[in-house]
From Swiss-Prot:
NCBIfam families attached to this UniProt entry: PRK15440.1 (NF011968)
Keywords: Lyase, Magnesium, Metal-binding
Upper taxonomic lineage: Bacteria, Pseudomonadati, Pseudomonadota, Betaproteobacteria, Burkholderiales
Catalysed conversion reaction: L-rhamnonate = 2-dehydro-3-deoxy-L-rhamnonate + H2O
Protein name per the record: L-rhamnonate dehydratase
SUPFAM superfamilies membership: Enolase C-terminal domain-like (SSF51604), Enolase N-terminal domain-like (SSF54826)
């Protein structure tokens, strides 16, 4: 069987949900008073959208093969990402065999080094890479997890990220991760409110249910260390992404100074094997949390995971729905997965990228069997309006 080549690449954009999960209507828990790097400014504390967290929107990448098969993927990137894909990256994709994923990744990455390396450029590369994996798996009529070597577990189990871990427990999740609401600029009163909220949630879920805090790059080392010590008495399992992503030295110190038994996690906003090599070699964390739609795609996540596995560090990918599920199902050092509660009040399970994807699986009772449908097993919803802002 001769492998088809790629004849077209298209970059589309979507507003309102999808992969840019911050792009939500008013009243959604994810846009509440949540600590961010911008919380130092009072005018940007009450709503994360106030400082533009949702300006990018969703980027949809389609790659079409010469036999008519279409692979696609979604990530965050919007019009900026679409420009990068259409005007720069497409030249490295069109005309290539669908099997040449490694070559295409290498060319995309090295061609963008002078303005890329991380951020929206890596989002764009990640989206193209995921679309290529979807395409190859569809051409071969196999699920992506089969291309990765096959599943090592029959089903995944999940913790839930959202405002209501108490409800997540009732739904069967193994743990709940709360957003931290107040940062250092809100002083002692803010710290006490953070701890009171954690204590209240602990009283609701009992002693054995995992509780974690998502700090979203909003803290400094002294505040994070104090928070960790005071939260330890409340049974906090881990403290996540406390510091700016580039503060490897701060993470290393924090990990040394937190209470014995508490885990330090990070990596959601890190990218490439080199970024994660820094986290691992400097012993910055106990768990890395790459986002497959931001870190370099599945091709790069495979490398990142191997680095972590060699050091005995767990890989629990950030969100990303099916793009993470297929990977987690194939790796022993990814024993569970994250599920983002995207219902506005975090009170029910809805597909993470709703309404953009059809057939997107969701956990039932906190568990899920990864589908065996070819590719990533999802379809684009034809009722969702998409734009193609650039062509090449």
């Amino acid at each position: 069987m001769s492998m088809p080549t790629i004849r077209a690449v298209r970059a589309l954009t979507v507003r309102g949900g999808g992969a840019d999960y911050h792009d939500q209507d008013a009243g959604h828990w994810i846009d509440d008073h949540i600590a961010t790097p911008m919380s130092r400014y009072p005018e940007y504390r009450q709503s994360r959208q106030s400082f533009g967290i949702n300006v990018l929107g969703t980027l949809v990448i389609e790659v079409e093969a010469s036999d008519g098969t279409v692979g696609f993927a979604v990530t965050t990137g919007g019009e900026i990402g679409a420009f990068i894909v259409e005007r720069h990256l497409a030249r490295f994709i069109e005309g290539q065999r669908v099997t040449d994923i490694e070559k295409m990744w290498d060319q995309m990455f090295h061609a963008t080094l002078y303005y890329g390396r991380k951020g929206v450029v890596l989002n764009a590369i990640s989206g193209v890479d995921l679309a290529l994996w979807d395409l190859l798996a569809k051409v071969r009529r196999e699920p992506v997890h089969q291309l990765l070597g096959g599943k090592v577990r029959d089903e995944l189990e999940f913790y839930a990220t959202g405002a209501r871990p108490d409800l997540a427990k009732e739904m069967g999740f193994i743990g709940g991760k709360l957003p931290l609401h107040h940062g250092p600029a809100e002083g002692e009163a803010g710290l006490r409110r953070n701890l009171d909220a954690l204590a209240d949630m602990r009283s609701r879920v009992g002693a054995d249910f995992w509780l974690m805090l998502d700090c979203w790059m909003s803290l400094d080392v002294p505040y994070a260390t104090r928070l960790a010590h005071e939260a330890h008495a409340l049974g906090l399992k881990w403290i996540e992404e406390c510091l700016p992503p580039d503060d490897y030295w701060g993470y290393a110190k924090l990990r040394r100074d937190v209470p014995r038994g508490m885990l330090v996690t990070t990596g959601e906003h890190e990218a490439t094997r080199w970024g994660f090599r820094m986290l691992l070699e400097m012993e910055c964390c106990d768990i890395i949390q790459p986002d497959v739609g931001w870190c370099g795609g599945l091709t790069e996540l495979i490398r990142i995971s191997a680095l972590a596995d060699a050091r005995g560090v767990l890989v629990i990918p950030h969100g990303s729905s099916v793009y993470s599920y297929h990977f987690v199902a194939t790796r022993h050092n990814s024993p569970f997965a994250e599920f983002l509660m995207m219902a506005p009040q975090a009170d029910r399970v809805v597909p993470m990228f709703d309404p953009l994807l059809l057939d997107e699986p969701v956990p039932v009772g906190g568990r899920m069997k990864v589908p065996d449908t070819p590719g990533f097993g999802v379809r684009l919803n034809p009722d969702v309006r998409m734009q193609r802002p650039y062509e090449h």
